[in-house]
Structure formats: C-alpha cells, structure tokens
C-alpha cells in the first residue's frame, strides 16, 4: 500500500513539475485514521500512512501548482467485495452485502461509478483549490457514535 503509491507519486511528479501543474489522487481507506478493525493493524497502518503522505506532498508541491488529495473509501460494491461475499456465504452471497449495507446510514454500498466520479472531480480543474484534502466516501459510516445518549431516529 505504501511503496507502490510512493513510487507512483515520484514517477507522476516528474512530468508534472516539467509542465508546471498537476493533480495526484491517492486512494486510502476509512480504515486507519478514522476506524479500525481487529486483525487489520498492518492494513490500517499503511492506509494511515497514505493520509500522511498526501498531506506532506501537498505542502511540498502546492507552490509548484501540483495538488495532492486522497480519498478514504468505505465499502463499495466492487467485484472484490462480491467475491468476498460469495466466499463467506456461497448459498446467499447477497446476505453479507446487505448486512454491511444495513450498518451504513445511507443503507447501501458505494457504486464504483460514484468513486470514479470523485476521482475525476479531484483530478479536474473544478477542484483547483483543493490540496492535502481527505475526502471520505462512505455513505456516512464513520459518522454515528457507537454509544449515544441521544434520541433514536
């Protein structure tokens, strides 16, 4: 998760420096600096490192008109998620997907196209004043408190 992104950034920065502008979008995860799961310490560590890398590179290259941002994805309905669902429940693979979706405030997983549209926006001139940003795309999964004295909705 870290070495490949680092190498990709270094390779991408060279032509961007030459042309005088550019945008890099790093794919991170909500796992790491926002949430953590038992047994995923190494994954969480690497994804948190990507957030730090985003911020460090953003500061370093902002004056060169190069923007670096990161996305922090929750669950998306990708072929990988569908494969994991099939492996966990070969009889009814839709069940684990719905179990995850039911815990998301928006009651669904992200569509791959929604994630792609966020990447396209961050790479476009429409986001020209964003750098060093962490954009969470998780349907609100990281918003609720696990314990609350508030009212139920």
Kindly give the residue locations of the regions a language model identified.
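Alpha-helical segment proximal to the catalytic Tyr-Lys
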Residues: 14, 59-63, 128
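Short, flexible catalytic-loop segment of classical short-chain dehydrogenase/reductase
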Residues: 33, 73-83, 87
């Amino acid at each position: 998760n870290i070495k490949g992104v680092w190498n990709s950034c270094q390779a991408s920065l060279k032509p961007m420096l030459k042309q005088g502008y550019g945008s890099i979008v790093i794919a991170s995860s909500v796992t790491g600096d926002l949430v953590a799961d038992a047994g995923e310490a190494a994954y969480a560590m690497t994804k948190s490192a990507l957030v730090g890398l985003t911020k460090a590179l953003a500061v370093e290259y902002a004056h060169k008109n190069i923007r670096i941002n990161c996305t922090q994805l929750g669950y998306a309905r990708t072929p990988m998620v569908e494969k994991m669902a099939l492996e966990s429940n070969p009889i009814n693979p839709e069940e684990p997907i719905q179990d995850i979706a039911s815990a998301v405030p928006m009651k669904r997983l992200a569509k791959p196209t929604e994630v792609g549209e966020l990447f396209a926006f961050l790479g476009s001139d429409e986001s020209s004043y964003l750098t060093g940003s962490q954009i969470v795309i998780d349907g609100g999964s990281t918003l609720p408190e696990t314990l609350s004295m508030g009212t139920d909705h």
